[in-house]
Amino acid sequence: MIRPCTFGIEEEYLLVNLGSGQVPATPSPAVMGRCREALGRYFAQEMFRSQIELASPVFTNLYEAREFLQRNRQRLRVALAEEGMGPYAAASHPCAAWLLQKPAAQGHYKQLFDDYRHVARRSLLNGLHVHVGVPPACDRMQLINRLLPWLPLLLALSTSSPLWAGQPTGYLSYRRVICGEWPHMGLPEALPDWAAYERYRALLQRTGALAADGDLWWALRPSRRYPTVELRICDGCPNLEDVLCIAALFRHLVEHSIAYRHDPLPCSRELRWIAQENYWRAMRHGRHAQFIGCHEQQPVTAQGWLAQLQAQIPIDSADAERACQHALHVLRHGTHADQQLRCLAQARADGLGKGQALRAVVAAGTCI
C-alpha cells in the first residue's frame, strides 16, 4: 500500500526595485522589515542581504501548499510594493550587478564567502527546494539512489535561468552551471546505503573538508535537520502552478520508491552514467533536450520521458494526476526560461533598447 508522505517547500527570492529592475546591494531596513512582517515565522535571510527565503510548514496535500504559498506570496508582494520593491523568483537575474552584492550579516554566511570567494559572490541564484518526509526505517541513501534517474526531468520542468550579465547563456538552467563550481553540489555521490553515507561524511569531517555541523549541497540530499529527503536541483519558479507541479511529482516519486524499496535496483552504475548525461542535457537544453531513457537506454523527448514515468509509476492520487497534467502542459508550452527568452526577443523586436528589454524580463520573473 502506498502511504502519503508529508512535504514542505522552500522558495528563495531576490528583492528587486520595481522601477529599475535592479537588485540593491543593501536593501533598506524598511524593506527588510516589510519582509519579516509579511512572512512572520516563515521568513529566513538567505546568503545575500538582497535575498530572502519563504520556508513553509509541513503539508499533507497540494491544497494546503497552494493556499499557503498563494497567501504568503501575495502578502510579500503587497508589503514590498509599499517600498517600490518586489520579490523576484526566477533562478537568475538577467542583469544584476552581482559583484556589488553584499553577503548577509549572519556569521555562517560570512564564513561561506571567506571560504569560497568568487564562487560564492557569483551565486546570486534562486532555487526551489522540496522536502518529503520518510519513515524512520527507510534508508535514505538507498531511497536517493532510486530517485536519482528522475532528477534531470524535474530540472527540465523548472528551468528559469537562461540569462546572465545581460546575455543569453545558451543554457536554460545557468544556475546549475554555477552550482557546479561549488564542492558537494552536483548529483549525489554513489553511496550504496546509509552506513556508507555516514562513513563518507566522517571522512570529509576528519580531513577538514566538511565542518562538524556542515551540510552537503547535493541536488538531492538527506536533510540533516529533518527526517526528509530534500530536492535541491530545481530552479526557482515564478509561476506557483509550476512549484506545485514539481513538489507533487517529487512526492509521488518518493512515495513509490519507499513502497518498492525492497525490490532490487537495476544496474546502478549505468543509471548513474545516464543520470549524469541527462543532467547536462537538462541544464543545456531543458525541455527541448533529447534525453536517454533510463531503462531502454534509447533517445527520448522530455514528453516521452514523462510518459515513461507515468507508465512505470502508476498515478494513484489526485495530486499526482494534476502534477502530471501540468507537467505535460509545461513541456508542451515552455518553462519560465522559455518565457524569458521570448520576452527578450519580443521586446527587442518592438524596438526597445537592451536595458528596457531586460527590465521587461525582470518584470516577468516576479512571483505570480
UniProtKB/Swiss-Prot annotation:
InterPro entries found in the cross-reference section: GCL_type2/YbdK_subfam (IPR050141), GCS2 (IPR006336), Gln_synth/guanido_kin_cat_dom (IPR014746), YbdK (IPR011793)
SUPFAM superfamilies found in the cross-reference section: Glutamine synthetase/guanido kinase (SSF55931)
Keyword Ligase appears in the UniProt entry: yes
The protein's role, per its UniProt record: ATP-dependent carboxylate-amine ligase which exhibits weak glutamate--cysteine ligase activity.
Organism: Pseudomonas putida (strain ATCC 47054 / DSM 6125 / CFBP 8728 / NCIMB 11950 / KT2440)
Lineage of origin: Bacteria, Pseudomonadati, Pseudomonadota, Gammaproteobacteria, Pseudomonadales
Family: Belongs to the glutamate--cysteine ligase type 2 family. YbdK subfamily.
Name of the featured protein: Putative glutamate--cysteine ligase 2
Biological process annotations from GO: modified amino acid biosynthetic process
Gene Ontology MF term list: ATP binding; glutamate-cysteine ligase activity
Its EC number(s): 6.3.2.2
Catalytic activity: L-cysteine + L-glutamate + ATP = gamma-L-glutamyl-L-cysteine + ADP + phosphate + H(+)
Keyword tags: ATP-binding, Ligase, Nucleotide-binding
